[in-house]
Regions:
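Hydrophobic transmembrane alpha-helices and immediately adjacent juxtamembrane helices
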Residues: 1-187
């Protein structure tokens, strides 16, 4: 965990800085009417930050295990140890990073006075499901990733596209093709 932020000036702040900058960008674009998001149930900055943090949690759950497996490739070949340990370590890293980001989300919710509802109390179930989904995709792609270095690069492009077709920065569409895509989108 500490190795992830070694040799950086900002260290763990990078976990918070990126989603804050992305949120500020989307809020700016929405306020300038460059994009028109429409109404949300909670203040738009809290909405966008929530979506961004959840998306980053999913993307981390998908990419972190693949990166750690790739980095441990030689060790996997030479040393006999439970290979599941790499996946468990990466899952721990994803959960700790996500927990740190959730503290930011809680602060923003308190700042904007977002009321505590039963939906928010059930959110941890959805969050765990989201992280497990990312880890499952990662497990499925791990063998291919070890054979072909392109898998991670294709995933990065795919995640960028998937971000925009997932209701992260906009409410779930109620009609049209976007609604159909959102309906079948597992994220």
């Amino acid at each position: 965990m500490a190795a992830q932020h070694r040799q950086t000036i900002l260290g763990y702040l990078w976990l918070l800085l990126i989603p804050v900058i992305q949120t500020l960008l989307w809020v700016f674009l929405n306020s300038q009417k460059v994009i028109n998001v429409g109404g949300t149930d909670i203040p738009y900055p809290a909405f966008v930050l929530t979506g961004t943090l959840l998306w980053q949690g999913f993307a981390d759950a998908l990419m972190t295990p693949l990166q750690q497996i790739q980095q441990s490739k030689q060790m996997l070949i030479k040393i006999h140890f439970p290979h599941e340990a790499i996946m468990l370590a990466s899952m721990g890293q994803v959960l700790v990073n996500f927990g740190i980001r959730m503290i930011l989300m809680l602060i923003v919710y308190l700042w904007y006075g977002v009321p505590l509802t039963t939906s928010l109390l059930l959110a941890p179930i959805g969050i765990v499901a989201l992280i497990v989904l990312g880890m499952m995709f990662s497990l499925l792609l791990a063998p291919l990733s070890l054979l072909y270095g392109d898998v991670q690069k294709v995933l990065m492009v795919g995640l960028s596209i998937w971000f925009f077709i997932t209701p992260v920065i906009y409410p779930i569409p109620t009609s049209g093709w976007a609604a159909l895509v959102a309906k079948f989108n597992p994220v």
